[in-house]
């Protein structure tokens, strides 16, 4: 009934002319008197046209309903996958997470793609991953991160993982490319922080960027000066500010941030504060393989103090 009433409202009003008889002075039908059939004509074509219009409208309505349902279903499915992926990530299930997300590598969803970039990189970082497999995974991760950024430029996480993946690829492309990429990496880390100032990881990564260029060997600095008029540079003090800021935003969020606070204080010859942060890094619960490696490194550094 709802469809019929809506359909009728869309159709033009039907004007039915009744037979008219206008008599002249002689009592006969005037020349302009007409009958209803002459106005409407043959009713069969009209009925066919009306039926076709009704069916066309019904088809359009059905298409809209199906399309809307498909969009809702697809959105619900993506949200379900993302929730499952986040659970696996928080649980430290690196391989299960990768196996889940790799099924959707052709996805057009930016949120899903940056998570796949992260998962690919995490698999590459595993000690059991061969060097050949690692290289393939690193380049694939960059591709996923790039696509994520193209699909959702407003995503802080997409900027962050794109920068991380560019940095990883630099290990295979030589010192010149690595230094040139440093400008791009910094730009995307800064954008990630701008979009989400409460993301401790992005702040931590800016600290790593500063730490890396603060400890750059003299020969690399020399190459950088030859290749670039204004090569990237930083200081341990600047790195320290970022590491502390990350800790303020989210205390004890990452074992590596604790380790780097200790290492940065060592570079600044402050052994007391270095020991404080290294002890925290050593005692950090080991949820991942990286956490275990950091525990070992922190213990070794403490032994040398």
UniProtKB/Swiss-Prot annotation:
Localization, per the record, is: Cytoplasm; Cytoplasm, Cytoskeleton, Spindle; Cytoplasm, Cytoskeleton, Spindle pole
Q: Per the record, what is one GO cellular component?
A: spindle microtubule
Task: Name the UniProt key words of this record, in alphabetical order.
Answer: Cytoplasm, Cytoskeleton, Microtubule, Repeat, TPR repeat
One Gene Ontology molecular-function label: microtubule binding
InterPro entries for this protein: RMD1-3_a_helical_rpt, TPR-like_helical_dom_sf
Q: Does the keyword Transmembrane apply?
A: no
A Pfam family matched in the record: RMD1-3
Q: Which residues carry this modification: N6-succinyllysine?
A: 160, 245
Q: Which domain of life is it from?
A: Eukaryota
Question: Which residue intervals correspond to the TPR repeats?
Answer: 163-199, 217-253
Gene3D superfamilies, alphabetized: Tetratricopeptide repeat domain (1.25.40.10)
Membership in a protein family: Belongs to the RMDN family.
Q: Quaternary structure?
A: Interacts with microtubules.
Name of the protein in question: Regulator of microtubule dynamics protein 1
Q: Which organism is it from?
A: Mus musculus (Mouse)
Task: Name the encoding gene, please.
Answer: Rmdn1
């Amino acid at each position: 009934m709802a469809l019929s009433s809506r359909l009728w409202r869309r159709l033009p009003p039907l004007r039915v002319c009744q037979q008219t008889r206008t008599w002249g002075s002689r009592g006969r039908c005037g020349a302009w008197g007409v009958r209803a059939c002459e106005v409407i004509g043959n009713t069969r074509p009209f009925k066919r046209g009306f039926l076709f219009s009704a069916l066309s409208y019904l088809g359009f309505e059905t298409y809209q309903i199906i399309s809307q349902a498909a969009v809702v279903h697809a959105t619900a499915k993506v949200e379900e996958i993302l929730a499952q992926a986040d659970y696996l990530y928080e649980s430290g299930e690196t391989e299960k997470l990768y196996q889940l997300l790799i099924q959707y590598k052709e996805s057009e969803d930016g949120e899903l793609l940056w998570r796949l970039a992260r998962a690919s990189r995490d698999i590459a970082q595993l000690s059991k991953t061969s060097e050949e497999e690692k290289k393939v995974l690193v380049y694939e991760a960059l591709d996923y991160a790039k696509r994520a950024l193209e699909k959702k430029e407003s995503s802080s996480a997409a900027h962050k993982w794109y920068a991380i993946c560019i940095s990883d690829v630099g290990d295979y492309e030589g010192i010149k490319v690595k230094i040139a990429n440093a400008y791009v990496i910094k730009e995307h880390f800064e954008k990630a922080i701008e979009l989400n100032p409460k993301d401790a990881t992005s702040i931590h990564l800016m600290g790593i960027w500063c730490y890396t260029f603060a400890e750059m060997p003299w020969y690399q600095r020399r190459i950088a000066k030859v290749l670039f008029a204004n090569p990237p540079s930083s200081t341990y003090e600047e790195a320290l500010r970022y590491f502390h800021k990350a800790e303020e935003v989210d205390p004890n969020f990452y074992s590596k941030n604790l380790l780097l606070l200790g290492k940065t204080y060592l570079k600044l010859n402050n052994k007391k504060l270095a020991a404080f942060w290294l002890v925290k890094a050593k005692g950090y619960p080991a949820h991942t393989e990286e956490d275990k490696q950091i525990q070992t490194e922190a213990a070794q550094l403490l032994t040398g103090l």
